[in-house]
A protein has these predicted regions:
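Hydrophobic packing and interface segments
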Residues: 1-612, 617-618, 654
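Long, low-complexity, intrinsically disordered segments
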Residues: 612-654
Length: 654
């Protein structure tokens, strides 16, 4: 079963890599090229039909922010459920203790759902989440002139409330009221952890609360007219350098509370339900993925609507309305990215816990030099991955810029229309002279949009190869490299665990920084384009001012961070954890034969006889549930193997 589940998750992760990384390169190559040549060099409005990169830019919004985000959240969705199902499978055959004592099988064949309640729970929670999302969309409504953000928030909170109610009844029905995990030591069964159904519910509640909390913090650091974004826009008055400095500071500060929320969710979920609780927290956060995806798609839809309004030369007030919608869309997109990063962190931890269970690892000893070395390598990988993604955008954007400049120079109709537009300096086309209008209209359809689309497409396919290989090959190289060099599969499993720990911690922080810094730069630029612009020392700086141009530069710097490298790190974290889970059986078999003489961790003999894992399988791989652990028994029966790793003396667990 585990092999089938991990294979499915690996497939979801692989496609997410292509959609997120490739989509990010596609959209930002077009966006950066269109902005630098169109808005900064030529001085024409965003999404103007004279800009050959306009179509590629609008298509890219859908490729990166809809398809890419959807694949990212789907990967987290699948990964969290599979991590929880694998850990739930370890409960099969364990014993439960009610409040009045008296042991009975909790997950045996005579229990609820033939003992598969813990395995089926993630699937049922996902089903309730789909229903909750459908109902939540009914609460999304805005009165004429109202704030669309309030309607979207109301829908999300409604879905979350429904999810909590449904989740409570599901968890209490599928799981026994209370149970314990045990470990066989010298023929004696030792209780290693105790759990309750209500504890599992609290774990799911913590995951849901963590997702909402990350969204609120992200909105504060990236939303229009919030303190941090206003400060970034005000710093634009003194030039691009101060704008970029302020944005970097904003992005770094924005990592604080999301990490605290994730830490609280991890500690709380582990306290209430052990490693299974961490996986259920990830499922709880992602159960309402349906409505979250709908909210994330709002931004690209509003952005494309503005592009269509500009290309169709609709009245000025139409573009102003779409710009206000787009500003809200930038915030929802930033919140969605924060949510995706938080969910990726919990999903990676769930998969990491499942890897430890399958590989038979009780603890990872960071004083072991192999583990410490791999921790550093893992922490380095997100920076290298981001560098590859950013460099890819830079190269593709350079090709796009050359193509747009070539068309402005070599297509006579475009060149003449651009000169007339610059001569009229922002005046509506209706106020131009008849001669100028004829020149402008002659350029209609002369731009070679297909060339720009082709550049983005080929760049996305070509440039995703290096980041993809880095994510896929590194865990395989580390695991089997250590196995070949040391000849010890147990050391290889520990080293791979260190690699995953390093990449998860570093990757989450870097992803939050890049995503939120880019979002702050984006909306700081938008503030110059709305209403009276940005007021500094009694002077209003509007669209087209030097401060606005500095904001455009900051936004251009932030584009590849928030839409390519930052979100792509989610895929790196989860894909590496999934690959580790896939290859874990190849690491555990030999290691266990060396230490225990068994083919699996602690319970191979029982599994051979009964056809299902023994109680030893469960507790050998999960150290404690909610802190009620008999550590003394573990300490008495562990010895040092000389490498700083504890090994059981008996075959009861490893």
């Amino acid at each position: 079963m585990i092999a089938v589940l991990t294979g499915f998750s690996f497939g979801a992760s692989s496609i997410a890599l292509f959609a997120r990384v490739g989509g990010g390169i596609y959209t930002k190559a077009a966006d950066v090229g269109a902005d630098l040549v169109g808005k900064v060099e030529a001085g024409i409005p965003e999404d103007h039909p004279l800009n050959p990169a306009t179509i590629a830019d609008n298509v890219g919004d859908n490729v990166g922010d809809v398809a890419g985000m959807g694949a990212d959240l789907f990967e987290s969705y699948v990964g969290s459920m599979i991590g929880a199902m694998v850990l739930g499978a370890l409960f099969i055959g364990s014993a439960t203790v009610s409040a009045d004592a008296g042991a009975a099988l909790a997950f045996g064949t005579d229990a609820k759902f033939e003992g598969l309640g813990a395995v089926l729970l993630p699937l049922f929670l996902a089903a309730v989440g789909i229903i909750a999302s459908m109902i939540g969309t009914m609460f999304v409504s805005v009165e004429e002139g109202g704030n669309p953000k309030s309607g979207l928030t109301r829908g999300e909170l409604s879905a979350a409330f429904i999810m909590l109610i449904g989740g409570f009844f599901l968890i209490t029905h599928l799981l026994p009221e209370a149970w314990v995990t045990t470990k066989l030591v010298d023929g004696e069964t030792i209780i290693t952890g105790s759990y309750t159904a209500i504890g599992v519910f609290y774990a799911s509640l913590l995951g849901l609360a963590c997702g909402i909390g990350i969204g609120l913090v992200t909105e504060n650091y990236t939303g229009i007219n919030t303190g941090p974004v206003t400060e970034v826009s005000r710093q634009s008055v003194t030039g691009s350098a101060t704008n970029i400095i302020a944005g970097i500071g904003c992005g770094m500060r924005s990592t604080t509370w999301p990490i605290i929320f994730i830490a609280i969710a991890i500690l709380g979920a582990y306290h209430f339900a052990g490693l299974y609780g961490i996986a259920i927290a990830a499922v709880g956060m992602l159960a309402n993925t349906g409505i979250q995806l709908a909210v994330d798609a709002y931004g690209p839809i509003a952005d494309n609507a503005g592009g269509i309004a500009e290309m169709s030369e609709l009245p000025k007030e139409v573009r102003e309305r779409t710009d206000s919608l787009d500003a809200v869309g930038n915030s929802t997109a930033a919140i969605g990215k924060g949510f995706a990063i938080g969910s990726a962190a919990l999903t990676a931890l769930a998969l990491f816990a499942a890897y430890m269970g399958v590989a038979g690892i009780n603890t990872i000893n960071i004083s072991n030099p192999s583990v410490m070395a791999c921790l550093f390598v893992g922490a380095m990988l997100p920076f290298l991955f981001s560098a590859l993604a950013i460099d890819a955008v830079g190269r593709a954007a350079g090709d796009m810029i050359k193509e747009v400049q070539r068309q402005f120079k070599n297509i006579p109709e475009l060149k003449a229309a651009l000169e007339k537009m610059q001569a009229n300096d922002g005046k509506p086309v209706e106020e131009w002279s008849e001669e100028d209008r004829k020149v402008y209209e002659a350029a209609d359809g002369k731009a070679e949009y297909a060339n720009c689309v082709s550049i983005s497409t080929s760049a996305a396919i070509r440039e995703m190869i290096k980041p993809g290989l880095l994510a896929v090959l590194t865990p395989v190289a580390v695991a089997f490299g250590f196995k070949i060099v040391t000849g010890d599969a147990a050391i290889a499993a520990q080293a791979l665990g260190g690699l995953l720990a390093g990449v998860t911690v570093s990757g989450v922080l870097l992803a939050l920084f890049q995503s939120n810094a880019g979002g702050a730069w984006d909306n700081a630029k938008k503030m110059f384009e709305m209403g009276d612009g940005v007021e500094v020392d009694g002077v209003y700086h509007k669209k087209g001012s030097e401060a606005h141009k500095a904001g455009v530069v900051g936004d251009t710097v932030g584009d590849p961070l928030k839409d390519t490298s930052g979100p792509s790190l989610n895929i790196l974290l989860k894909l590496m954890s999934v690959i580790a889970l896939v290859i874990a059986p190849l690491l555990v078999a030999e290691g266990d034969q060396k230490t225990n003489g068994n083919a699996t961790a602690g319970g191979a003999n029982t599994e051979e006889a009964t056809g299902k894992p023994s109680a030893n399988d469960i507790t050998a791989n999960e150290d404690s549930g909610d802190g009620n652990t008999t550590d003394e028994a573990n300490d008495e029966n562990n010895t040092d193997d000389g490498n700083g790793e504890s090994q059981p003396e008996s075959g009861g667990g490893s």
